[in-house]
Amino acid sequence: MHTEAVGGAARRPQKLRSQAAAPACRAMPSEFTSAKLRSDCSRTSLQWYTRTQHKMRRPSLLIKDICKCTLVAFGVWLLYILILNYTAEECDMKRMHYVDPDRIKRAQSYAQEVLQKECRPRYAKTAMALLFEDRYSINLEPFVQKVPTASEAELKYDPPFGFRKFSSKVQSLLDMLPEHDFPEHLRAKACKRCVVVGNGGILHGLELGHALNQFDVVIRLNSAPVEGYSEHVGNKTTIRMTYPEGAPLSDVEYYANDLFVTVLFKSVDFKWLQAMVKNESLPFWVRLFFWKQVAEKVPLQPKHFRILNPVIIKETAFDILQYSEPQSRFWGHDKNIPTIGVIAVVLATHLCDEVSLAGFGYDLSQPRTPLHYFDSQCMGAMHWQVMHNVTTETKFLLKLLKEGVVEDLSGGIH
């Protein structure tokens, strides 16, 4: 017992001494202890290595995340472009080419009736002011004027509702334009009749061209062609109202005395307009920011260019149609941007004493009828567009018709 105790006591200090004497990372008295010590010894260095690796990986992970987000954004953008350019494969073109003869006679007779009535000075804007009260500015300038300081209303919102952060670019554009008002020969006319010619397929076959040419001011929208369709839509053009992606690509759609009224939606639109006024080529990198091909040239002299007053768009959207004001969004639209057609209708009430419409109206219950008078795109494509509230706009136009503010020559608004 004593020997064992002494032996045990003698061996225990020896074991402790050997552990104490040995360097911490070298003591290997047993397999278990060895493994444990190696684990303890390596933990600190492993933690340091892991932290270092994480630091080294952060930039590469960040780059990967950016690449992923870019690819996702590009994919969504591509899908958006495909939707915008969606065209139904089967469109009932027979409906476009056949029009009831009685309907043709009624449309032509009604157009002549409107033209033969005595013109009523200031009728349209007075009626708009009575209908919408303070939501319609009766004395609003239709085009942006060259003044020392832009109005507060012009600078309140971003394009297309205003020119906030773009005032210097607007002034630079105005410096290039020798004229900013409605042409003198039109302003001097005691009473002017406007017709806003929409792009609707309902125009095809009505043979309203002769009647439309008799209006004092004919407003056409975007790239809607005249060549080859003059029997139905006329060939007189006083104003071509559009934005870069909507401008005609063919020179034959521009006439020497046209007014080219531009709606500016985004930053690159200013660059495009500047290039068109100066008859310069648009840099390739700028073209990448448009969602479709834009015109390389607008064959008109600088005196024929105008910039639409953005307050007209603002009043049309937020005051008359009562859309919500723009909110900051990562992607998409709030459907608070009026169509060029409805904006043109409001513009016409500021320019002319009486206003008529032709080629307006979306019959969404007939998805396979032609959407435009000049192509095979179908009405069903309107279900895919994401920027405009067609239902609200139709109610607005119906209200104008009911109150007698405008006339519908083609009978498409219902």
Curated annotation (Swiss-Prot):
The keyword Lipid metabolism applies. Keywords: Disulfide bond, Glycoprotein, Glycosyltransferase, Golgi apparatus, Lipid metabolism, Membrane, Signal-anchor, Transferase, Transmembrane, Transmembrane helix. Mainly expressed in brain, and then testis, heart and liver, almost all tissues showed some levels of the gene expression. It holds the Pfam family Glyco_transf_29. Residues 1-65 are cytoplasmic. Glycans are attached at N235, N279, N389. It is found in: Golgi apparatus membrane. It catalyses: a beta-D-Gal-(1->4)-beta-D-Glc-(1<->1)-Cer(d18:1(4E)) + CMP-N-acetyl-beta-neuraminate = a ganglioside GM3 (d18:1(4E)) + CMP + H(+); ganglioside GA2 (d18:1(4E)/18:0) + CMP-N-acetyl-beta-neuraminate = ganglioside GM2 (d18:1(4E)/18:0) + CMP + H(+); a beta-D-Gal-(1<->1')-ceramide + CMP-N-acetyl-beta-neuraminate = N-acetyl-alpha-neuraminosyl-(2->3)-beta-D-galactosyl-(1<->1')-ceramide + CMP + H(+); ganglioside GA1 (d18:1(4E)/18:0) + CMP-N-acetyl-beta-neuraminate = ganglioside GM1 (d18:1(4E)/18:0) + CMP + H(+). InterPro entries: Glyco_trans_29, Glycosyltransferase_29, GT29-like_sf. It comes from the Eukaryota. One of its GO terms (cellular component) is Golgi membrane. GO terms for biological process: lipid metabolic process; protein glycosylation. Disulfide bonds join C194-C352. Disruption phenotype: Mice are viable and fertile, and do not show any obvious abnormality apart from an increased sensitivity to insulin. The major brain gangliosides derived from GM3 (GM1a, GD1a, GD1b, and GT1b) are missing. Its EC number is 2.4.3.9. Residues 87-414 are lumenal. PANTHER family: LACTOSYLCERAMIDE ALPHA-2,3-SIALYLTRANSFERASE (PTHR13713:SF60), SIALYLTRANSFERASE (PTHR13713). (Microbial infection) Gangliosides GD1b and GT1b (derived from GM3) may serve as receptors for some C.botulinum neurotoxins (minimally types BoNT/A, B, C). Transfers the sialyl group (N-acetyl-alpha-neuraminyl or NeuAc) from CMP-NeuAc to the non-reducing terminal galactose (Gal) of glycosphingolipids forming gangliosides (important molecules involved in the regulation of multiple cellular processes, including cell proliferation and differentiation, apoptosis, embryogenesis, development, and oncogenesis). Belongs to the glycosyltransferase 29 family. This is Lactosylceramide alpha-2,3-sialyltransferase. It comes from Mus musculus. The gene is St3gal5.
